[in-house]
Regions:
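Long extracytoplasmic/lumenal interhelical loops at the membrane interface
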Residues: 277-340, 359-361
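Alpha-helical transmembrane segments of multi-pass inner-membrane proteins
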Residues: 129-157, 173-239
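Membrane-interface helix-loop-helix junctions at transmembrane boundaries of multi-pass membrane enzymes
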Residues: 13-23, 66-77, 193-206, 243-252, ...
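N-terminal signal-anchor transmembrane segment
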Residues: 3-68, 82-96, 149-150, 379-381, ...
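Aromatic-anchored transmembrane helix interface
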Residues: 52-55, 77-87, 97-121, 130-134, ...
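Transmembrane alpha-helices of multi-pass inner-membrane enzymes
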Residues: 61, 191, 369-382, 387-429, ...
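Hydrophobic, aromatic-rich transmembrane alpha-helices
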Residues: 4-17, 54-69, 184-196, 342-362
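A membrane-periplasm/extracellular boundary helix in multi-pass inner-membrane enzymes
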Residues: 148, 236-281, 298-302
Length: 445
């Protein structure tokens, strides 16, 4: 009684119930964890914040490992495949004296995201939605800050070596083309979170779509236009069930990504559509010089096809270019082949196939299934000319979320009748109430 009377005299801003209900404060722990694991490019490149993020990532990984051991969470097939996939590039990295620190940092960071998703997949509905909400809001904040930096002209200048010819503005999410690393995952997370509400379109989905489209238009990212068009076609097709399975599935999207890479990079099928590409996208069939990079990359990869060359200190750049500069492959599968050879490529496809099959077999509703398939298909096709496993590494979110789609958004994670949800390890406080001697809860806050 004394505590209650004292609490009534406190200012509203000091009310513990208010602090518990306040979204930024209540979710601060989880928001911090997600920020460390999904840090924007500018933060990772900062000479002070970059090393700090590496230390914090190791701490978060150790914390998650401890939670998995204490709660006896079994090691999943996606986790095993991801570890094997990363180990495939470890051997050539060590053998060729590559960037072992970068390999370890990326491995711990992405594995921690998977472990965080699997941890929350076992909690109750409220906790599962909390994870989706925090991840969605974090990426939306990134997009809004990035757009403000674009409009105000703030940021830095990204250059390669001493050649100012290649210098271009860099914002929170990196250079112009890197905005797609955040746009499409933000759209997916927003659609997944809003699928749990009764509204057809939640404000997070609307904000993700509008902010993404505005930045794509402002920065003139042709690759993102292709992805947006694919997403706009696939989403209603899945919702209308025009064709069950086939290409309109997660496994179909995985196969489509591999097939498009072979057709565009190896067979050069785009040469037959030169007029359409130039008319719609304003691009030539060389795809802004990417075909020249692929022509130079393939002979290099052929010299070490099985195990590749490992993670180098040039952030994956290995193709000789203008004035001694090195470039990345500008194709996701070619870059993975350089990092870990055909072994890494095979394990990467196995990871995508396993998680896609699990998502296809899940009992998620049509909105969830359509969102996963549409955005994943778009990113799979866009990875033909870009690399989304580097930088923020947001491409990994697709197999990670797909592997736990039913638990996160279906009924797999709900507690049994009479059993309360497990408390979140990073949530500030839980529900409180008064229980009568008969076991009836009379009041809950």
């Amino acid at each position: 009684m004394l505590f209650r009377s004292m609490r009534r005299t406190l200012p509203a801003v000091l009310d513990p119930d208010l602090l518990r209900r306040c979204y930024p404060l209540r979710y601060l722990g989880l928001m911090t964890v997600c920020f460390v694991l999904m840090r924007p490019i500018m933060v990772g490149q900062d000479p002070t914040l970059g090393p700090l993020m590496k230390v914090l990532t190791a701490a978060v990984f150790a914390w998650l490992v401890n939670l998995h051991i204490v709660r006896r969470i079994p090691v999943s097939a996606p986790a095993i495949l991801f570890v094997l996939y990363r180990l495939a590039s470890l051997l050539p990295t060590v053998y060729r004296d590559g960037d072992l620190l970068n390999w370890g940092y990326v491995t711990l960071s992405q594995l921690s995201i998977l472990m965080l998703i699997e941890l929350y997949a076992g909690y109750g509905r409220q906790e599962r939605r909390r994870l989706l909400r925090v991840m969605t809001d974090l990426l939306l904040i990134y997009l809004l800050i990035n757009y403000v930096m674009i409009m105000t002209g703030t940021g830095s200048v990204a250059s390669w070596g001493q050649h100012e010819f290649f210098a271009q503005p860099s914002y929170l999410l990196g250079i112009r083309t890197r905005v797609t690393d955040c746009v499409f995952p933000a759209i997916l997370l927003a659609m997944l979170y809003d699928s749990g509400s009764r509204r057809r379109w939640g404000w997070r989905t609307v904000l993700a779509l509008t902010s993404g489209i505005v930045q794509i238009v402002t920065l003139q990212v042709a690759t993102a236009w292709v992805g947006a068009a694919i997403m706009a076609i696939v989403y209603p097709a899945v919702r209308l069930r025009l064709r069950a399975g086939g290409l309109l599935s997660m496994r179909g999207a995985t196969l489509l990504g591999v097939a498009v890479t072979l057709l565009v990079v190896v067979a050069r099928v785009q040469t037959y559509f030169a007029a359409q590409i130039e008319g719609l996208l304003g691009k030539s069939v060389t795809m802004t010089g990417r075909t020249d990079l692929w022509d130079a990359a393939i002979p290099i990869l052929a010299d070490s096809p099985l195990f590749g060359y490992g993670i180098n200190s040039q952030f994956g750049a290995f193709i000789p270019a203008f004035k001694g500069l090195l470039w990345q492959a500008h194709n996701q599968y070619l870059q993975i082949a350089y990092d870990g050879g055909l072994v890494a490529v095979g394990l990467f496809i196995a990871l995508l196939w396993t998680t896609s099959a699990r998502a296809d077999a899940s009992r998620c509703d049509d909105r969830v299934r359509a969102a996963l398939i549409a955005v994943y298909t778009a990113m799979s096709v866009m990875s033909v000319s870009e690399i989304y496993v580097y930088n923020m590494g947001t491409f990994y979110l697709f197999p990670f979320l797909a592997s736990r789609a039913e638990e996160l958004l279906g009924g797999g994670g709900r507690p049994e009748p009479g059993e309360g949800p497990r408390p979140s390890p990073v949530a500030a406080g839980g529900p409180t109430g008064t229980i009568t001697p008969t076991g009836t809860i009379t009041r809950i806050r």
